[in-house]
């Protein structure tokens, strides 16, 4: 409350600082009586012609996963994000003076600071963001056009990110920040924006286009972000194109339920094939922690005990990741609790090594072998002993481990 009062005083002083002496008395009489009223006044003074641009910039500032540089935020003004269409970046719409464009559109609601050599756009005060997403603004008759719905804002930024990535089709060269200012942000955060609420459903057409295997957009991003998943040694394949199994695999890994559903209907055989580093699409979905996607894949015939190139099953992966809910679901649907990988390790080895006590308890409840030896003779109990995890050791001692097993 005290902080809000200081902010209110600051805003009033800013108004008075720019007024002529002859207007001082009138301005004093018209000053807003609260911080909310101050922000309403600022919103009303935003030029009607600039409303759509100001609103878009404010939306991005509300939901951005990191502070945006001036050139990144200004790039949002160059996008055609018409409903129902694929986002298009128009270079002719870019402003020459990007900082002026941002500040003139958003007025005193935002400011620019210098941080580590970059010019960063931020809200002038934390209360600005709070007000823009508040029910108080939503109930206003005139100013409610600036009320920001968070999920819709994620949709806007997701569309822009995909618009940037759709403009890139070179698999080796990363675009310069001068050519595509938003590329760095888009590459890192597009997935997080799509995973919010119903954003994936809203931008379905754009997402389908990005994942189109006949295009190079998705493969261009993928080969930069997941280079270990693909070999370019084959002389029989076009190295710019992805393996046919990669699309479903990565849709599952990223948790795109709607896209996975469309893909398995279109190519049901892909459910069973290795698509990347983790293994099958089912491996990928549980690695990403996406139980709904895993359930969808199982409903379309995925093998719950399918194996990766290293003989890992989905249960091995979830046991190491510590996803108790998914571990329980896999076990209840027939996952082999004592399946061994190429090293002879069972899921219990993985959960013990990772220190996931609750997962270990669940595996033991379903018959996990506490004395199962790996190829080197190591048992889950010896793994716990090496780690010094006291609670884990006590849990395993309840199941009569062979404390002498293993190679010495």
Protein language model regions, located:
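Ankyrin-repeat boundary/"N-cap" motif
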Residues: 240-248, 273-281, 307-313, 340-346, ...
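Leucine/isoleucine-rich amphipathic helices and adjacent mixed helix/strand linkers
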Residues: 2-273, 280, 284-295, 299
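Tandem repeat protein-protein interaction scaffolds
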Residues: 312, 317-321, 329-332, 336-345, ...
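Conserved ankyrin/ankyrin-like repeat signature
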Residues: 259, 292-293, 325-326, 358-359, ...
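Ankyrin repeat A-helix N-terminal signature
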Residues: 250-255, 284-290, 317-323, 350-356, ...
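Polar/charged low-complexity regions in secreted precursors and cytosolic/nuclear IDRs
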Residues: 278, 289-292, 301, 308, ...
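Ankyrin repeat domain, specifically the short helix-to-loop turn at the C-terminus of the second helix
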Residues: 262-270, 295-303, 328-335, 361-368, ...
């Amino acid at each position: 409350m005290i902080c809000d009062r200081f902010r209110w005083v600051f805003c009033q002083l800013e108004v008075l600082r720019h007024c002529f002496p002859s207007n001082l008395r009138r301005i004093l009489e018209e000053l807003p009586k609260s911080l909310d009223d101050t922000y309403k006044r600022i919103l009303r003074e935003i030029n009607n012609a600039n409303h759509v641009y100001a609103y878009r910039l404010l939306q991005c500032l509300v939901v951005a996963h990191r502070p945006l540089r001036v050139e990144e935020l200004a790039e949002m003004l160059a996008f055609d994000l018409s409903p129902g269409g694929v986002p298009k970046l128009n270079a002719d719409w870019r402003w020459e003076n990007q900082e002026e464009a941002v500040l003139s559109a958003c007025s005193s609601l935002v400011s620019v600071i210098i941080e580590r050599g970059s010019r960063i756009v931020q809200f002038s005060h934390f209360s600005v963001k709070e007000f823009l997403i508040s029910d108080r603004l939503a109930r206003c008759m005139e100013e409610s056009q600036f009320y920001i719905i968070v999920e819709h804002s994620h949709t806007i930024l997701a569309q822009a990110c995909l618009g940037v990535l759709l403009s890139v089709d070179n698999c080796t060269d990363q675009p310069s920040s001068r050519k595509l200012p938003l590329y760095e942000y888009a590459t890192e955060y597009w997935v997080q924006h799509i995973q919010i609420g119903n954003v994936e459903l809203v931008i379905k057409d754009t997402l389908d286009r990005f994942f189109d295997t006949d295009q190079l957009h998705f493969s261009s991003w993928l080969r930069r972000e997941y280079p270990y998943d693909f070999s370019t040694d084959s002389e029989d394949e076009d190295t710019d194109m992805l393996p046919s199994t990669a699309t479903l695999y990565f849709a599952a890994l990223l948790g795109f339920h709607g896209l996975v559903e469309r893909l398995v209907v279109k190519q049901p055989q892909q459910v069973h094939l290795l698509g990347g580093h983790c293994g099958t699409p089912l491996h990928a979905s549980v690695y990403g922690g996406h139980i709904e996607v895993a359930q969808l894949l199982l409903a379309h015939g995925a093998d719950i005990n399918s194996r990766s190139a290293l003989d890992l099953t989905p249960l091995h992966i979830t046991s190491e990741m510590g996803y108790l809910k998914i571990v329980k679901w896999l076990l209840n649907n027939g996952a082999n609790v004592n399946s061994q990988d190429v090293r002879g390790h069972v899921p219990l080895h993985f959960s013990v090594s990772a220190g996931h006590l609750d997962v270990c308890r669940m595996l033991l409840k379903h018959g996990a072998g506490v004395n199962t030896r790996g190829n080197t003779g190591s048992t889950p109990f010896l793994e716990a002993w090496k780690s010094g995890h006291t609670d884990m050791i006590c849990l395993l001692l309840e199941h009569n481990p062979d404390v002498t097993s293993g190679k010495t």
